[in-house]
């Protein structure tokens, strides 16, 4: 990450033209989850739901920007497992260079504010870092 004085953190809706970039970030994200999933690098496949984020009005994909740099993504949908009529964080990824500086917490707050109401957020039971992050964000 380039050093910037308090760069703005924002969400930018991803478009169909952004699909290759988002697909690459999803691949990076899935690679980072391998130690928690029990899968191998060979098991990483294309994120099968990605095309739906450009056609289904119940799904929204955002790039996370720190200044003008892409720092990750958040995928939001209404396909919840427990809470009907709610939104879900389907996937949430902050690139390593942007972690530990409050970016994730700010993005979570912006995302929740953009879609008021009930939310569902799930993590892998073995991913203690994710569990701690979401507990600190949600309180």
Residue spans of the language-model regions?
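A short beta-loop-alpha structural element at the N-terminal edge
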Residues: 9-24
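Helix-loop element at the rim of GNAT/NAT acetyltransferase active sites that forms part
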Residues: 24-40, 53
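Active-site rim helix/loop that mediates acceptor-substrate recognition in acyltransferases
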Residues: 39-63
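Conserved beta-strand in the GNAT
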Residues: 63, 69-78, 88
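Conserved acetyl-CoA binding element of GNAT-fold acetyltransferases
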Residues: 84-96, 122
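Conserved acetyl-CoA-binding loop-helix of GNAT-fold acetyltransferases
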Residues: 94, 100-113
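Conserved acetyl-CoA-binding loop of GNAT-fold acetyltransferases
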Residues: 112, 135-139
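Conserved beta-strand-loop-alpha-helix junction that forms the acyl-donor binding cleft
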Residues: 120-135
């Amino acid at each position: 990450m380039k050093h910037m004085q308090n760069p703005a953190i924002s969400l930018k809706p991803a478009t169909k033209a952004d699909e290759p970039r988002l697909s690459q970030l999803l691949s990076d994200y899935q690679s980072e989850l391998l130690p928690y999933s029990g899968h191998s690098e060979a098991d990483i496949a294309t994120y099968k739901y990605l095309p739906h984020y450009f056609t289904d009005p119940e799904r929204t994909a955002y790039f996370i920007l720190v200044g003008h740099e892409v720092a990750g993504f958040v995928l939001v949908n209404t396909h919840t497992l427990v809470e009907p009529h709610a939104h879900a964080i389907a996937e949430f990824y902050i690139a390593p260079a942007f972690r530990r500086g409050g970016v994730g917490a700010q993005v979570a707050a912006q995302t929740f504010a953009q879609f008021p109401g009930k939310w569902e957020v799930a993590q892998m039971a073995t991913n203690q870092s994710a569990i701690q992050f979401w507990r600190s964000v949600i309180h």
